[in-house]
Amino acid sequence: MPGKEENDTLEKSLKELNLTSDEMTKFEKAFKDPEFIKLFEEYAKEVSDPKVKAETDAYLRQIEQQGRAEDVYGAGTQLIVPDPAGAVIKTKVVSSSASKKQQQEQEKQEKEQQQQAAGAGKPEGPGKQGALPVGQKVFINICTCDKLERYSLTDAQDPATGRLRPKLTIPLSLGPVRQGADKQGAPAAVYDFVVHPDSWTFAAGNAAGLATLADTALDHVEQVGRCRLVRAWKRLNCRYKGTEGAAEPPVQCIRTSAAAAAGAAGEGAGGRVRPRPDVPGVPDLPGAKTAPPAAAGAAATAAAAAGAAEGGAGSSSRSTFSFDKSRKAGGTEAAGAVAKQEATITDPARPGYRHPDGAVTPEWGLLHRGEADLGEAWGDAGKGLAAGGRVPKELVVRVTLPDVSSAAPVDLDVGARCLALTVPNRYRLSVQLPYGVDDAKGRAKFDKARKVLEVTLPVVPPPAPPPGAAAAARAGLALIQELGGSEEAAEVKAEVEVEVADVMGRDQEAAHAKSEAGAGAGVKSPHTAAAASSGAAPAPAAASEEEEEEDKEDGGPAAGSGGDPAAAAAAAGASSGRELTENERKWRELHARQQQEEQEQQEAAEAAAAAAAAAAEPSSRSQLTGTVAQGGAAAAAESVAAAKQQVQQQPVAAAAAPTAVLRPRLNRELAMELD
């Protein structure tokens, strides 16, 4: 709890602000409230917190990097990011330029000037920096920045002698004083003195140049601090003298002549620029850095010289904020351009469209939010996730409302496929949604810092397909496809018949070969008779048994089918225990028909071979009998050989050297899978 003396001090300070009676009553009542005093102390600590200062400096660096200093702080404003040059000057205050009585008179004059400015409607800027106490140490950091103008060395006429002498001009920027400490922990004043890199290179190259640069820095510190410094300065062996929360030089803000042309001259040399009220938030614009104006360096030099001539604020005074609102004159042309652009917009949903009642369509965006399974692309880095054709889970509508401080005046209406937003006399928006949404489960959130309203609407899932559709989809993905009565099906059937005819032709050739073998078997040679007496079966019979076994394995005609292919196919389907498809039934009929034809051809070939053998046997016997009677066993052997040669010359049994015929067997299951 603050004591009585502290309360009296606060009341006295409030009286010095020259407030109205109503404002004074509110302040006195507020400062008597312990809760308000507690909050005020927390605010003061937060403002003076080094972390907060570091965040502010980082924000200014971001603005400078993006090249948006003029957009945020007004025309003619430049942000300077100093870079330590590696030189620190140490000196001490030997005397103050004003006594205590003179300081009181000066403060009184400043107060009168502030009252006059308030009466004239001008902003009230902060007072000048107080004089540095005697004996306090002062550290001046020499820094560089390429945004300042480089030095110039010209010949100028000396007013005293009238002779031409070299004149060195060094454009500079002096930052505000910061409270630091020396090695012993005693309070010390710290300044940042910024020049162009070429100016520092020129000064560091010779002793005279360095002395001139140091004297220039001391002169400006004396003008700002209203004191006298020891000229016997000392250069420290360190890169930079920092303070608490500022290990690096903080960002400085300077004003150029363009600021006065834009109507910001009312801030004067003692005020710091403030952010423009018409720039909502800090949008993310990476890579938007622009080059500084060509006349910025010269204008900065002129501003620095003018500040030095005024004797109260060099360029350091330009780093404090003020509350000037006289920036309306420079915005007339921009407002006209914006109005012209709004007049050319004819789409009500396009941002910037002005409705008949004066409302404007705000900036807005529509996002599709969904879910994806990373397992779909697992193990294949180049596969990716297919996003097309998927219905999103949610629709997100983001609307930027820069002139709205809360969600209270916003009227939001959401339908099944539309969204309407209205802010009376300010904004109006109507959006058609690409998907149906569940308005009862939607949610909205307003970000006061960014002035953005975010509306999240869950998408109504599509209706489930009928039960038969899933089976049809699975059937469409199968390898077997039913063939209809189209022309393509007829062409496929013709191709299958041609392939079957080729197979049948090869089977007929094999049947001729078998008939030859049967004809040869009809004339029993001594070797054949020996094989028969030993009980060995002939080779063709064995081959036929193997073929019958293969036919049984392949699902040939069933017993009792009567040779009907359709009946055989039906019997095969009944044996499998399931109903055959049209394609399977056709394949089974074709296979059964092929086996039936093969069997008929084989039987015909065997009958022909038997008939030929029966016709050749009587003639061979008669010839053999006559030969035996005439010439004995030798002549009989020759007759048997001649008869055998005659049998081989028959047209039915004519064949070349014995060859092995490999006939491909049709596998029904494989053929149906490859169809």
UniProtKB/Swiss-Prot annotation:
Ranges of biased composition (kind: Basic and acidic residues): 102-113, 579-596
UniProt keywords, alphabetically: Cytoplasm
Keyword hit for Cytoplasm: yes
Transmembrane intervals: none
Cystine pairings recorded for this chain: none
Secretion signal span: none
InterPro entries named among the record's database cross-references: Kintoun, PIH1/Kintoun_subfamily, PIH1_N, PIH1D1/2/3_CS-like
KW Cytoplasm (keyword) present: yes
Phenotype caused by lack of the gene: Paralyzed flagella, leading to a loss of motility. Electron microscopy image averages show that a density is missing from the inner dynein arms region in axonemes, which probably accounts for the paralyzed phenotype.
Biased composition (Acidic residues): 544-553
Primary location class: cytoplasm
Subcellular localization: Cytoplasm
GO annotation, cellular component aspect: cytoplasm
Pfam families the record matches: PIH1, PIH1_CS
Region (Disordered): 98-131, 265-293, 310-340, 509-659
Comp. bias (Low complexity): 279-293, 529-543, 564-577, 604-617, 628-659
GO BP terms, alphabetized: axonemal dynein complex assembly; cilium movement involved in cell motility; outer dynein arm assembly
HAMAP family for this protein: Kintoun
Family stated for the protein in its record: Belongs to the PIH1 family. Kintoun subfamily.
Known role: Required for cytoplasmic pre-assembly of axonemal dyneins, thereby playing a central role in motility in cilia and flagella. Involved in pre-assembly of dynein arm complexes in the cytoplasm before intraflagellar transport loads them for the ciliary compartment.
Protein name: Protein kintoun
Gene source species: Chlamydomonas reinhardtii (Chlamydomonas smithii)
Phylogenetic classification of the source organism: Eukaryota, Viridiplantae, Chlorophyta, core chlorophytes, Chlorophyceae
